[in-house]
Amino acid sequence: YIITQNANADLKWETKKQTNLGLDFALLNNRLRGTVDVYDSKTENLLFDYTVPQPPYPYPTIKANVGSISNKGIEVSLAYDVIKTQNSTLTLAGNASFMKNEVLNLDGSINGVPLNTDYVGWGAANSYLVKGKPIGAFYILEHTGKNENNVETVLDRDGNGIIDQGVKSPDRYYAGSALPTYTFAFNPSYRYKNFDASLLLRGSGGNKIYNGLRSNLSRLENIGKSNVLASAVDQGIYTSPYGSDLWLEDGSFIRLENLTAGYTFRFTDKYIDTIRLSLTGNNLFLITDYSGIDPELNVSGSGRPEDNFGGDRGIYPRTRSVAFGLTVKFK
């Protein structure tokens, strides 16, 4: 048997305090409807795996309640019936949310042993928990090019002639967060007599993604050893000891999540009331500047920290599907 985690008898639930101010409204004989919700929340006693010294602890990390974070934002939804008659309706609906996240505090200790709560690694490479910044803050080296030996070069910000790759290195700079600052969706629907159609567009933005997969496949030293991207030839970087912002990309996207069209046949038969035929497409297209497979990463990833929350080391692509539907309603 081996020890895989340290015991902590003082673990408790995270606590959250939240204030909401909401408004629901309907105007123009209920043709214009909407909601507005403003919130301010604070979560304390955050559960997280922190680094501890060995000894006295047998395992290098311990799950503990340390720190607090703040979330502030606004959520808005609107729907408007552009056409509303007996035979046809056209409704435009959508929602959007904007959020500001901040790490308020990370100080803490267990039984007098201080925890490493400053610049704690969070998910992707070069992503940390830093007081005063959003969770998943990227502190990273700035790519400047390559030298005569085709080795990547980065900016020496403090000018001391040494590239410091330490967590608190003065050569690192804040380059954004893995957490989106806004999300949105657009959901129009149309009906004319027995025909109906609807779609769902959604997206998010304001976040960064560290494309670790692209980084691993962009070194010419790996030619003949493993796969290398065609773009690596143009970049011409033979090797690199750095994880620079060359691989940090915008994670914004717009996705056509769903498109459905259908027609309903009505019967006077004593057994069948209606038969509806429909055609549905899911994940039909994606608009993004991200060069990876998909900018919408799973927060849980594969279970490895480097694959979580803003890090992409290779994910399964989302399935694109087209389905035919038949719905029979009996009397």
Segment roles from a protein language model:
Residues 38-44, 80-82, 96-102, 192-194, ...:
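Transmembrane beta-strands of outer-membrane beta-barrel pores
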Residues 1-33, 61-85, 177-182, 311-323, ...:
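Outer-membrane beta-barrel signature, preferentially recognizing the C-terminal barrel domain
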Residues 15-19, 38-44, 60, 70-74, ...:
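Transmembrane beta-barrel architecture of outer-membrane proteins
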Residues 63-71, 118-146, 227-230, 238-243, ...:
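C-terminal beta-signal and terminal closure region of outer-membrane beta-barrel proteins
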Residues 21-25, 36, 76-80, 186-192, ...:
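Residues on the lipid-exposed face of transmembrane beta-strands in outer-membrane beta-barrel proteins
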Residues 12-57, 97:
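Membrane-embedded beta-barrel scaffold of Gram-negative outer-membrane proteins
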Residues 201-284, 289, 295-298, 302, ...:
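Extracytoplasmic gating/loop element in the C-terminal half of outer-membrane beta-barrel translocons
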Residues 64, 81-178, 282-292:
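Conserved small-residue
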